[in-house]
Amino acid sequence: MLHLHILSWVLAIILFIATYLNISKNQGGSPFFKPLHMILRLFMLLTLISGFWILIQSFMNGGANHMLLTLKMLCGVAVVGLMEVSIAKRKRHEQSHKMFWITMALIIITMVLGVILPLGPISKLFGIG
């Protein structure tokens, strides 16, 4: 399940950037916008489902830092929401660059939290998790 989660969020980030850049300020969405947006939503849903599954497994197994897991879950849900809001703002021709960069910063924070959690690579490297 961890591999599905990592694959889905990597593809979601790539699709988010592609979808965001496929909206022109003058002409609106390109012909590729709607399929990209639908595929992005699919991968965001896969990310959320696999993330909740990993969260439930970590809570049941014990030994995990529940506060960091909950914080990462909240950041992940916020990232998905901010992705949708920034794409919607750009589609309505509103100022969306600030929202885009806030979303990217929150993506990085969420990734850092995932790296330091018990299933992350740093925890495995030092034998913590």
UniProtKB/Swiss-Prot annotation:
It comes from the Bacteria. Pfam families: DUF1516. InterPro entries: UPF0344. Its main location: membrane. The keyword Amino-acid biosynthesis does not apply. The keyword Transmembrane helix applies. Keywords: Cell membrane, Membrane, Transmembrane, Transmembrane helix. GO terms for cellular component: plasma membrane. It is a multi-pass membrane protein. Belongs to the UPF0344 family. NCBIfam families: PRK13673.1-2, PRK13673.1-6. This is UPF0344 protein SaurJH9_0969. It comes from Staphylococcus aureus (strain JH9).
